[in-house]
């Protein structure tokens, strides 16, 4: 009789199976949102790759739902750990991008609020800075703020700082 109970404990309940299949569908929907070059980094079967690339074609609600269910079915044979690892990597790179973006925004605000000390600190971090150009942009941004004009120069400062940062990191 203990063998019978042991067999029952190893079987998954219908609810558990449904939860797992639903999780695969959600993961498949997230995969469908990736760009093709990101999908190329994953070890996917050809059928799943085609289904993921076809997903944007299904725009009607029921058709999309049915297609996502099909993707979930195809995902049963996939290496889920590799897919989850890619999403962790993408999320980490997105976090890094956001952190860098916020750091550049702080530099812009510091340059606008601070004086020459802020400019000197920035030039210390970014030695390739064109001081004269940056001073002109700062002066223009302060003038726009005083005149209650749209912050066009402030945007130019951010773009200039971002370009300097990208060139320093070798992204340009």
From Swiss-Prot:
GO molecular function: ribosome binding; rRNA binding
Keywords from the named record: Cytoplasm, Ribosome biogenesis, RNA-binding, rRNA-binding
Cell compartment(s), UniProt: Cytoplasm
Cellular component terms (Gene Ontology): cytosol
A GO BP annotation: assembly of large subunit precursor of preribosome
Record-linked Gene3D superfamilies: PSPTO4464-like domains
InterPro entries linked to this entry: DarP, DarP_sf
Signal peptide (from-to): none
Function: Member of a network of 50S ribosomal subunit biogenesis factors which assembles along the 30S-50S interface, preventing incorrect 23S rRNA structures from forming. Promotes peptidyl transferase center (PTC) maturation.
Family label: Belongs to the DarP family.
PANTHER family: UPF0307 PROTEIN YJGA
UniProt xrefs under NCBIfam families: PRK05255.1-1
Protein name (record): Dual-action ribosomal maturation protein DarP
């Amino acid at each position: 009789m203990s063998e019978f109970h042991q067999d029952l404990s190893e079987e998954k309940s219908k609810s558990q199976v449904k939860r797992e299949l639903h999780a695969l569908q959600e993961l498949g929907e997230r995969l469908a949102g990736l760009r093709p070059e990101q999908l190329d980094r994953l070890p996917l079967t050809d059928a799943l790759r085609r289904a993921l690339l076809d997903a944007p074609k299904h725009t009607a609600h029921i058709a999309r739902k049915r297609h996502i269910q099909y993707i979930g079915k195809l995902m049963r044979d996939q290496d889920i750990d590799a897919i989850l690892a890619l999403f962790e990597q993408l999320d980490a790179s997105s976090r890094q991008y956001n952190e860098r973006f916020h750091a550049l925004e702080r530099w812009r605000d510091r340059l606008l609020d601070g004086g020459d000390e802020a400019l000197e600190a920035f030039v210390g971090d970014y030695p390739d800075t064109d001081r004269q150009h940056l001073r002109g942009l700062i002066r223009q941004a302060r003038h726009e703020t005083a005149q209650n004009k749209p912050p066009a120069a402030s945007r130019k400062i951010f773009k200039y700082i971002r370009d300097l940062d990208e060139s320093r990191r070798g992204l340009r």
